[in-house]
Amino acid sequence: MTTTKNFLPEQYRQNNKLGINHNYLNQQFLDHEAIWSKMREVVINGDFTLGSEVDLLEKEYAQISETNHAIGVGSGTDAIFLSLKALGVGEGDEVITTAFTFYATIGAIVTAGAKPVFCDIKADYNIDPSGIEAKITPATKAILPVHWSGKPCDMGAIEEIAQKYNLAIVGDACHAISAFYKGRTAGSLGTLACFSFHPLKNLNVWGDGGIITTNSDELADKLRLMRNHGLVGRDECHIF
C-alpha cells in the first residue's frame, strides 16, 4: 500500500516525526486518474461555469454543514465580501472583527465599503466576546469572528450579543471546514459562514474556490444572483 507520506521529500519526512500529512504544495496526488477522469468529463460536457458539478458540491456541502444552503463562489475572499453585501453592509457601516487574521478578512470589509473595528483576542487567538459589546455603535451592522486554525470561536457568547443588538454574524470559517462547536458544524454557526478551498486549506481545489453556508432562503437566493452578476438565465438581470 502506498501512503501519501512516501511522496514527500526526505528532508520533509525527517522533520515530520509524527507522520502528519501537512499540506505540501509539491505533493503528488494519490489517485491521478480519478481526478483527471472527472476533469475530462467536465471538459467534454462543457460544464465550465456553475454547472452540474457545482450543483453537486453545493448539495453535499450543505449536507455535511447541516444547513439548508451552500453557495459556491470563487474564493474564501469572495465568500466574505458577498456575504457582507448580501446583508446590505456598505458605506458608513462598521463590522467588528479581529486583526489576527489573513488580510482577506479585513479587505472584504473595506471593499464592501465598511469600516473594520478591531476587538482583542483570547489566548486561543480567537476573538474575545467580552470585548465585543464595548465596540458596538449605531453604525455596527455585523460581527465577523475568525475561527483561527479551525478552532471555532465562543459562538454561544457571540450569538447572544448579536441577538441582543440585532446584528448579523458572518463567520470566517476558511480554516474550519468540518469543525464543530458544541455539536454544531462551523457552517451552521451565525447568519452566514464562509469557507475557502485555497490549496493551503484542509479541503482544497486545483486553483481557488470558496463556499458560503446559511439557513436563510432569502440570503441564499440573493447570493446566487450576486455571484453571477445578478443574472437569471440569459435574459434577466437584477441590479443590486
What are these regions (language model features)?
Residues 1-86, 90, 111, 163:
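Conserved PLP-binding active-site segment in aminotransferase class I/II-type PLP enzymes
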Residues 5-7, 176-182, 189-240:
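Active-site region of PLP-dependent enzymes
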Residues 65, 90, 138, 187-188, ...:
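Structured loop/turn residues at beta-strand edges in well-structured enzyme cores
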Residues 24, 38-39, 61, 79, ...:
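Generic structural signal for small/hydrophobic residues in well-ordered secondary structure
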Residues 50-54, 76-80, 102, 125, ...:
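Conserved donor sugar-nucleotide recognition element shared by glycan-biosynthetic enzymes
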Residues 59, 156-159, 208:
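Active-site phosphate/pyrophosphate- and oxyanion-stabilizing loops and adjacent acidic/basic residues
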Residues 7, 85-173, 180:
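PLP-dependent aminotransferase-like
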